[in-house]
């Protein structure tokens, strides 16, 4: 198998393993159409992780702002290039995912505590 095929195999395994661990905590799998399509792990419609066609995995960063443009919450952003060593690659991704998952709940709590009036905006940050 080419590295490309191997990395897609790794992506599937990592997503399956995370889903097994987190589905009882509200994480769901979303998928685009087609072969080697992007897969997403989401909670309440918020995507925490997605796979890329080239074998990369991204754990996303999202910032929430109140009506005064104060950032009131954020969750972690980590970009993973695939590695031939599955355990190393999976370990990094899972650690980042766990952090994003915990930060998501921390952010939701902070948003509720602030009882912000008006609309809360979300802004997806691009990867540098």
Regions found by a protein language model. Name each.
Residues 1-7, 96-111:
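Contiguous, amphipathic alpha-helical segments that mediate oligomerization or scaffolding
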Residues 1-38:
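Negatively charged, low-complexity tracts enriched in Asp/Glu with abundant Ser/Thr
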Residues 12-19, 98, 102-105, 117, ...:
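Generic detector of well-ordered alpha-helical segments enriched in charged/polar residues
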Residues 36-103:
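Intrinsically disordered, low-complexity regulatory segments enriched in Ser/Thr/Pro
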Residues 110-128:
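Short acidic, low-complexity intrinsically disordered linear motifs used
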